[in-house]
């Protein structure tokens, strides 16, 4: 099946917003075994949108339109598609009730007539309820071509796709079962090299590598009758892949950290902290709180994290963490001594079970004769204090800080897994 994505909105063409919906939808379609062959962006113009829909209908089996479902005159996606299909717009009862409930809590004057447009669907379509907004989506098949209309705001679109569209498409078309393996500590080129025979000779299941900032994923996919058979086939392939070794002789199982498209090193670490009822603190220099803000983004973070430190300058490291200023000057802020001292002092000052620290050179200039991308990460527990040195070369300042944070989470994760093995 060939699918096409159409993003509707002049703000996309003018660069005011980034079309993140296209990436999300492409990934979701891939999970369902639906190939996205084309992506188009078009402004809020009926004539041009009609032209784009016409072209898409001639070359694609599934046409997904995003955006333009709001209350204003330039929100014309449903109206234009209805015109193309020669269908009327009708009101969806559930969407109308949601409008009633929403405006019942507001001043009567706030419900202007144009808001009613958000409750309209194309006649004969299956409504797609909007759990986080007011504009209802829809699914309709005409002359063998299926059309989907979705809201533009990502929070609304993602909810509608996950809860409404994916289950609907799964029933309509044969399902592709997938498993995503996540790796940290090996590059895409090396991973593809050590798995080249699997990738070059793949039939079913298939293997698709994807490089992300600082990590790599492998999507294993199979088309089969049910989940149980898929789990068996994908599990066998996974075991074969993880038995391979990197070019340095390290088992791939050692750089594999988890499953899932939406998973992360931070999430894996957070869940282990919760599992073992451990608390953590951090003292950050070059990452300036990125580790702590990432950890705090998870619901329930207060179970494991009470606070930490951001000490950017040498003087603040001495003042906030109680590290000897003369020793800091002697060893330098970009050093194992400073990283270990920051981690241990943070742990002692907060009473946490684990202290982690990040100090280094974000770039682009050198610091203390150390090149950009040099990072020291410290980790302290009740029984030991240690540090690692990481060189993150060829990256922007932003990516150096982000990848350093990944290394810190991975270091904590490995420490917690050692605890798991002792139980």
Curated annotation (Swiss-Prot):
<dbReference type="InterPro" id="IPR036653">
    <property type="entry name" value="CinA-like_C"/>
</dbReference>
<dbReference type="InterPro" id="IPR008136">
    <property type="entry name" value="CinA_C"/>
</dbReference>
<comment type="similarity">
    <text>Belongs to the CinA family.</text>
</comment>
<dbReference type="Pfam" id="PF02464">
    <property type="entry name" value="CinA"/>
</dbReference>
<dbReference type="Pfam" id="PF18146">
    <property type="entry name" value="CinA_KH"/>
</dbReference>
<dbReference type="InterPro" id="IPR036425">
    <property type="entry name" value="MoaB/Mog-like_dom_sf"/>
</dbReference>
<dbReference type="InterPro" id="IPR050101">
    <property type="entry name" value="CinA"/>
</dbReference>
<dbReference type="Pfam" id="PF00994">
    <property type="entry name" value="MoCF_biosynth"/>
</dbReference>
<dbReference type="InterPro" id="IPR041424">
    <property type="entry name" value="CinA_KH"/>
</dbReference>
<dbReference type="InterPro" id="IPR008135">
    <property type="entry name" value="Competence-induced_CinA"/>
</dbReference>
<dbReference type="InterPro" id="IPR001453">
    <property type="entry name" value="MoaB/Mog_dom"/>
</dbReference>
<protein>
    <recommendedName>
        <fullName>Putative competence-damage inducible protein</fullName>
    </recommendedName>
</protein>
């Amino acid at each position: 099946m060939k699918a096409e994505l159409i993003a509707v909105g002049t703000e996309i063409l003018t660069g005011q917003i980034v079309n993140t919906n296209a990436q999300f939808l492409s990934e979701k379609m891939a999970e369902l075994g639906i190939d996205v062959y084309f992506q188009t962006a078009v402004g809020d113009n009926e004539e041009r949108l009609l032209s784009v829909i016409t072209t898409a209908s001639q070359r694609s089996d599934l046409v997904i339109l995003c955006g333009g479902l709001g209350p204003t005159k330039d929100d014309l996606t449903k109206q234009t598609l209805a015109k193309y299909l020669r269908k009327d717009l009708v009101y969806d009862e559930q969407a109308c009730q949601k409008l009633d409930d929403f405006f019942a809590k507001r001043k009567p004057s706030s419900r202007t007539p144009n808001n009613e447009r958000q409750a309209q669907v194309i006649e004969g379509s299956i409504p797609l309820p909007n759990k986080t907004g007011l504009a209802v989506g829809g699914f309709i098949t005409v002359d063998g071509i299926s059309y989907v209309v979705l809201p533009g705001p990502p929070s609304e679109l993602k909810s509608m796709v996950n809860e409404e569209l994916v289950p609907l498409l799964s029933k309509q078309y044969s399902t592709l079962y997938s498993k995503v393996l996540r790796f940290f500590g090996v590059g895409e080129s090396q991973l593809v090299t050590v798995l080249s025979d699997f990738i070059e000779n793949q039939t079913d299941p298939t293997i698709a590598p994807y490089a992300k900032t600082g990590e790599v994923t492998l999507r294993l996919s199979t088309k089969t009758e049910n989940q149980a058979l898929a789990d068996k086939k994908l599990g066998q392939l996974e075991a074969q892949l993880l038995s391979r070794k990197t070019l340095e002789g390290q088992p791939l199982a050692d750089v594999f950290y988890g499953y899932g498209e939406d998973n992360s090193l931070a999430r894996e670490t957070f869940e282990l902290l919760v599992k073992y009822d451990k608390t953590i603190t951090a003292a950050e220099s070059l990452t300036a709180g990125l580790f702590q803000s990432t950890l705090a983004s998870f619901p329930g973070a207060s179970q494991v994290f009470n606070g930490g430190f951001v000490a950017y300058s040498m003087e603040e490291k001495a003042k906030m963490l109680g590290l000897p200023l003369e020793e800091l000057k002697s060893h330098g802020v970009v050093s194992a001594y400073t990283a270990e001292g920051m981690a241990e002092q943070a742990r002692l000052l907060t009473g946490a079970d684990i202290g982690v620290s990040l100090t280094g050179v974000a770039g682009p200039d050198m610091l203390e004769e150390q090149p950009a991308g040099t990072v020291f990460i410290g980790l302290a527990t009740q029984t030991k204090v240690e540090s690692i040195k990481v060189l993150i070369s060829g990256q922007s300042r932003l990516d150096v800080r982000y990848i350093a944070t990944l290394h810190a989470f991975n270091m904590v994760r490995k420490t917690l897994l050692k605890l798991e093995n002792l139980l």
